[in-house]
Amino acid sequence: DSRIERIAVCRNKGIEIFKDKIKEFSIYIPMDLDLNLFKFVDIETFESLIDSFIDDNNAQGYFPFSFPYYYDIFALRKKGWVDGNALLNSFKLKRKFIIGAFIFNYIYIFSKQFKKEKFIEDLIPVESAFGGIGLYKVNNSIKYYELDKNDKYFISEHISFNEQFNYLFICRDWAIEAP
């Protein structure tokens, strides 16, 4: 079993349980419990972030920006930053060319791990992200991700889940520690 598969099973079970209990909309907060998500954020700051998210009529999802750099390239999709499946591209090239594995990892992964100072806006629009925790506005039409058993190591379950939402943002000032 892969970590991705375990995460997808947990997310799907949670959605199955609470989906019928949602009336208009609810806040859904999935999180990776194997990360220290609150090292840089106290409870008051997190509560304020949730309140700001609820009040933001344009947003359907908020995600943190990890420190010292954004690490979750696997779940990230943003034009000009990560346009496709960087991990899969790196893996395919490393299988063809044994020498130079670090170069492929650098090109497809490490060079995409930006620091928050690269961005001006407080809310960075993305097609998909995660980074250990997310805030979502959901209603009872929410669907869960069907894991493709053939691609379970190279497809982030967050990307398929995030396709249900139009306005997703990485919050520049919501910091978590990169693993």
Please tell me what each predicted stretch does.
Residues 35-138, 142-146:
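Conserved catalytic core of nucleotide-sugar-dependent glycosyltransferases
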Residues 1-25, 31:
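Active-site-proximal specificity loops/subdomain of glycosyltransferases
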Residues 1-4, 39-44, 149-153:
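Short, flexible/disordered intra-domain loops and linkers
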Residues 123-125, 131-142, 149-153, 158-177:
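Catalytic donor-sugar/metal-binding loop of nucleotide-sugar-dependent glycosyltransferases
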Residues 9, 13, 44-48, 160:
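Alpha-helical elements of Rossmann-like donor-binding domains used by nucleotide-donor carbohydrate transfer enzymes
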Residues 23-25, 56-60, 165:
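Short, high-confidence coil segments that cap the C-terminus of an alpha-helix
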Residues 29-30, 61-64, 169-171:
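A structural signal for short, well-ordered beta-strand segments and their strand-loop junctions
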Residues 71, 177-178:
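Generic structural signal for helix capping and beta-alpha/helix-loop junctions
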